[in-house]
Amino acid sequence: MNNHYHPTGHRDAKTYAGDRPWPQWPGVPSGLSSSSGLLQNRYYAPAGPFPLLPYFGELGAGPDTAMNQAKRQRAEVSYQQPRPYPTGRGTGSMGYQSKVRVTDKYKVVGFISSGTYGRVYKALGRHGQPGEFAIKKFKPDKEGEQASYTGISQSAVREMALCSELHHPNVIRLVEIILEDKCIFMVFEYAEHDLLQIIHHHTQQPRHPIPPNTIKSIMFQLLNGCQYLHTNWVLHRDLKPANIMVTSSGEVKIGDLGLARLSYKPLHSLYGGDKVVVTIWYRAPELLLGSRHYTPAIDMWALGCIFAELLSLRPIFKGEEAKMDSKKTVPFQRNQMQKIVDIMGLPTKERWPLLTSTTEYSQLSTLQPPIHHGGHHGHHYQSQRQAAAANAGVSHLEKWYYNTINQQTGGSGPGSGTSPLASLGAEGYKLLAGLLEYDPQRRLTAAAALQHPFFSTGDPVSANCFEGLKTEYPHRRVSQDDNDIRTSSLPGTKRSGLPDDSLRPGKRVKEG
């Protein structure tokens, strides 16, 4: 039995066995009306016998009409209120435990990373529970010698609720939740690598591109995981290389659902309570332009940015984030939008009919149209600007793509050069353009992207993104000098061993 995905999107029977029922397409997941679960579908969601997830416009109609008021109210209560998680559901091992000490069940090996949420540690199982695990400890509301406990953060509640219900090979698996001394510990399966680390490895001298079959496998698995989330009405909202885990067997897993939200009510603004979502470099244009009724399309834009980064080994839209003002209002992210315009051209009403309804539409007039640098030498700067203004809406993404995949040969058009990435060809560009479509309603869905010819041409897509590679990627850095999981002090968010500018957006700038 081989280990490849079929063009339909299923893996061989080894993974998508007949004893797992096909996910039922929900008007709204019926499990939302039950106190026992948030999501009806806990099974795999390969591209197959479902209709596409509908993408709603700013005021689109949707599945909300298929669910009566009583069910909606029960769903909201089920989602918003934290509750103990019963054991023995899903995979059979995930549960909520409040009378067990984390160090009794796990031997902490060392510290992996930290962020605004808390810290992540690597651990080994004890007492007949073999294997490696990642333990995420949420920091207390107020830090100090004596932690102050005032409740569970909204982000923690969301992540616990969603992770306890989501079960898919391309989504990181939650093993259990432990509450100890008013601290929450989420125990996840461990992945030896993350996508940021893999990209960084290829930037080391001699710089070498990620092999095309590896890129195909990574993108297919990401899209497969995203389709599962979107089929279950979950928006991830923070897809970026640092949040994509990769196991030693080459299985790609979407992680960090701290910003994820349910999206079954298209008329309900998803903006309230979440001033900013998605790391700036991967933020979709509708978010930058102030859209409040965004859709799963924001995740697809982020996947397009990740695809481009796998090709070029650097973020395609590397802008600087503007600070909030004293009133805590979110400013227009002019610099980031300009980075997008430089490659994609200015958005137009023809390309994006609902563009004028975005709250920051007027700000587009403050942006500079892209200058095409491939013209004849000797042209005056002013004439370049005039030409740019006349073609402000023209995208240069195709030129960027072919320059990138042919970078080792200097070619700039389809089929030129012998770079390893040249085999991705025109279908690679079409997939990238579909993911980086300005109009969220025209942007590729995860299901449609899985059916794209990019994945059915050339070698079969492998379920192991490392298949055939001679490269051995270093494992995630673990600091064994810092393995006290009980400590309350937290370091900065930077992870050692990787360049700062690859971990987070550049220095923030104050917008006038």
UniProtKB/Swiss-Prot annotation:
Q: Short name of one Pfam family for this protein?
A: Pkinase
A cellular component term (GO) from this record?
mediator complex
Q: Which cofactor does it need?
A: Mg(2+)
**Residues annotated as binding ATP:** 112-120, 136
- What EC number(s) does its UniProt record assign? 2.7.11.22, 2.7.11.23
Supply the SMART domains for this chain: S_TKc
What ranges does the record list as Basic and acidic residues composition bias?
476-485, 497-512
Which Gene Ontology MF annotations are present? Answer: ATP binding; cyclin-dependent protein serine/threonine kinase activity; metal ion binding; protein serine kinase activity; RNA polymerase II CTD heptapeptide repeat kinase activity
Q: Which InterPro entries match?
A: CDK, Kinase-like_dom_sf, Prot_kinase_dom, Ser/Thr_kinase_AS
Q: Which residues form a coiled coil?
A: none
Record's signal peptide: none
Q: Which residue intervals define the domain Protein kinase in the entry?
A: 106-455
Give the family, as the similarity comment puts it: Belongs to the protein kinase superfamily. CMGC Ser/Thr protein kinase family. CDC2/CDKX subfamily.
Q: Could you tell me what this protein does? A: Component of the SRB8-11 complex. The SRB8-11 complex is a regulatory module of the Mediator complex which is itself involved in regulation of basal and activated RNA polymerase II-dependent transcription. The SRB8-11 complex may be involved in the transcriptional repression of a subset of genes regulated by Mediator. It may inhibit the association of the Mediator complex with RNA polymerase II to form the holoenzyme complex. The SRB8-11 complex phosphorylates the C-terminal domain (CTD) of the largest subunit of RNA polymerase II.
Name-wise, this protein is Serine/threonine-protein kinase SSN3
Q: Give the organism the record lists.
A: Chaetomium globosum (strain ATCC 6205 / CBS 148.51 / DSM 1962 / NBRC 6347 / NRRL 1970)
This chain is encoded by the gene named SSN3
